């Protein structure tokens, strides 16, 4: 458009030698302020503006006539004026001013072009390659750019904005007060016509924009106004009644040039800027003005033709390469502070609304698109690219847009979303499924099938779309369901090492398991555990491998070893680790009930496997069967046995990892009891009764008795569920050989049938027995804490029984100081129980009572000490560690009475106590020394003598234990170590140099380390007499000791000693001055 007019042609008759500064000075002269504008009357402001424009034009002409240095600039301006196709003078002073300003701007462009043409930069100096190259002469300084920007603002304000029709662009009155004054002083009736003025200004501005230095300054500030003018010039309808002014002024060629120029500048500028300006031109929904006072100030709505045009142009921007990013940036950039720059909450809400708006725009197929499928095929890869921006500041908003678009498209067009969004996102894992066909050329052993970047990006994208968005749309769930087994295998692999996608895999699995229907979730867990072989998994020829940047790659498997035992071991260990990881995963699924449902499923599966005997599984082949049939039969038997082992292994892991909170509602408890009863009935049918099965049956029936006994507030719906147990209870009561269980089953049937209105003593006794098998220190509130389905009101009501039964006894549910004699006796009896968990729990309860200074427990301190000492000899670590804790706490309360007994027990020989018991007493003494702290000085003599005697014990383990306790004691004594420091040092030197056992020598050197660490800077005072001997000992160990661990301890001790001596010889300077105030 600009190149077609004469304004773009370079002047030929005048030698352009005028300087750049002269042109800019002339422009400054036009912009110089005029007379006073202090009056507040509007008419006065108009007059001041017109007078200023006239005076500035007159001053410019006078400067041209009087100043000889400006003659060349005047000649250049006159030549450009002769070439121009528009009138420079008019009755409207605003247009005369605008015309002269445009001519000077063209002069500026010609001067810059000539400077560039004459510029000949010298060759760079090879000796100084780091020097900056010569600056182009058309580069404007900061002050020159400000002058040019001011001139542009006047040109746009006087020559473009006043001639835009209502609804096109931002009205001039709404911008500034000066804009309102300009709108009033412009005379639209004067020649040239308003449309011609707009065309001339837009053409000259586009001509100026062809110069690189000027174009960026023009479009960065005034692109919207120029685009609005071109839209009006090229697309405003011409058929009007009466005929409009556009039709009278512009030719069809000029309108075509305007359309072409609009598309050219839209392609030329920064695309987010183009999108933002087009949205501004398109305008928002019409908002009617109800206030009469403000009706004149309401902004006119954009015309229909302009809205359609902007919509079409925006769609073209969108469907260009990287068009999605341009649209998103155009809407979001510069709007981080919210709609009105308000508070953080308002800004966040505004961002969410904008993201939803962009998602709707992207998810809606434009009308000019050939088909919805072609549109989504083009933009969906760009939507996926929004997840992978590196700039953290903008990545959050872009990811939010991408996630919202993902969800919107998945709801409105699930087929296209699955084809163009989900499949490309999940492709790295889909091509490695067991059901996929991998080309043989790719299966080179060790070849990378999925790179670290691809797999990390896939997992991160799935996490953002599924977990962060948190919208369980059916197409999303269905697309991820076939890949769950691969995700679980990936999760198991990440547990073996450090990887940044470990937590992402776990969150994805937990999210999908919770959002799936319960049947599908259980089926997925079956696939995880290996019970369901039909679930797609990782291709058998593929494997995961750790990558270099903390990620994971998928490679083709290496050649398998011929060692069958090694292969079998790898297979078994892999299955075992996967089951362990499945248990860890289900730990997070207890509250939602999934863990309980899967546990019940495993119990039912076990019952079915017990019911199915080999003969019932498949008929035994006859002697005339073929070898193929025999092999098939043997394969089925092996698979059956393998499935049984898998179920048993899975149940063992679940029982080990799951807590008592696994069941969250009554239905799950009933299902658990039903599975147990069915298994018991199956065992009776095969005459396979066992002690373990009998105990399990008693426990499950006791659990029902607890529920019926009032620990849970049961509703009528709960009794409807409990009635499912009636047939099984009847079968147990008729066929089970144990009369006690028979009677309990019959009584439970009666209690369930009567909804708890009648209950026998057998039910109450079973409930009490079940509760007593729990930890006496716990509150029996499992069922009441896990689910809102189970009310807590039942704990406040008496049991609903016919003959009255005592409620559950909880040993420490009362506050400290309120323990009854009966409760104390029960815990003492539990401390002697043959069951390890019961005994250990009772010991810990007694220790807790001692720690809380319970009066009833402290009165029986001798009895408690006896119980703790007896349990020290127990072989189970849970029991003897609980006893050690109890003795240590008791010694803290009564050190004088108990410490003597402990020292005697520790100092006794092998004939009285086993070495293991003496080691446990040594652990107690170490804890007692730590607990006493500074009070240990009172018992210094007996402790040190006992430990020094222990160093001479024939048992090497006891010698090491004594040295460890001695080191702990020396750390606590500090200065009080002085009287015995020589004895201790001599002992350590002798042991470290002469003892035959390496563990004892290590312990001796470690005592020196503890001694130096405990004393720190006090070592030079406490150990002043023996410090040199200890140093010689440590050097001896470093040089001559064959054991590396002892050498390491000695080196650490030398480092401690070096630090102590440095601080002693060179104390840190304190920059302080002592000031004494005289009286």
UniProtKB/Swiss-Prot annotation:
Biased composition, class Polar residues, residue ranges: 785-794, 802-818
Q: Does the keyword Isomerase apply?
A: no
- Region (Disordered), start-end ranges: 767-818
Record field: transmembrane: 473-493
Q: Where are the HEAT repeats?
A: 864-902, 937-973
The UniProt record lists the keyword Repeat = yes
- What keywords appear on the UniProt entry? Membrane, Phosphoprotein, Repeat, Transmembrane, Transmembrane helix
Annotated Pfam families = ARM_TANGO6, RTP1_C1, RTP1_C2, TANGO6_N
Tell me which GO cellular component terms the UniProt record holds: membrane
Q: Which residues form a coiled coil?
A: none
Localization per Swiss-Prot or TrEMBL? Membrane
Q: Give the chief site where it resides.
A: membrane
Provide the membrane topology annotation: Single-pass membrane protein
> Where is the PTM Phosphoserine found along the chain?
561
- Stated family: Belongs to the Tango6 family.
**Record-given protein name:** Transport and Golgi organization protein 6 homolog
What is the organism lineage in this UniProt record?
A: Eukaryota, Metazoa, Chordata, Craniata, Vertebrata
